[in-house]
Amino acid sequence: MGMRMMFTVFLLIVLATTVVSFSTDDESDGSNEEPSADQTARSSMNRAPGCCNNPACVKHRCG
């Protein structure tokens, strides 16, 4: 492959990655805010007893 062909393939990969990144971001509402206290309380109520919300907790991970 020539340099021009390799550069074109590189640009196509970057473009495809960008399109995939933007399409998966549609699920969010665009805000980067922390969850409210009500949302945090509701999510912790739905967990079984003994579950750990901390990602570093390996012993009692649920979910």
Swiss-Prot record:
Acidic residues bias (residue ranges): 24-36
InterPro entries, per database record: Conotoxin_a-typ
Propeptide stretch(es), residue numbers: 22-47
Main localisation: secreted
Keywords: Acetylcholine receptor inhibiting toxin, Amidation, Disulfide bond, Ion channel impairing toxin, Neurotoxin, Postsynaptic neurotoxin, Secreted, Signal, Toxin
Signal peptide (from-to): 1-21
GO molecular-function terms, A-Z: acetylcholine receptor inhibitor activity; ion channel regulator activity; toxin activity
Segments of skewed composition (Polar residues): 37-46
Modification sites for Cysteine amide: 62
Start and end residues of each stretch annotated as Disordered: 23-49
Disulfide bridge positions per record: 51-57, 52-62
Subcellular location as annotated: Secreted
GO CC annotation: extracellular region; host cell postsynaptic membrane
Pfam family, one: Toxin_8
Tissue specificity field: Expressed by the venom duct.
Family statement drawn from the similarity comment of this UniProt entry: Belongs to the conotoxin A superfamily.
Extra information: Negative results: does not inhibit high voltage-activated (HVA) calcium channel currents in rat DRG neurons (at 1 uM toxin).
Annotated function: Alpha-conotoxins act on postsynaptic membranes, they bind to the nicotinic acetylcholine receptors (nAChR) and thus inhibit them.
Record remark on domains: The cysteine framework is I (CC-C-C). Alpha4/4 pattern.
Name of the protein in question: Alpha-conotoxin-like Bu1.1
Organism of origin: Conus bullatus
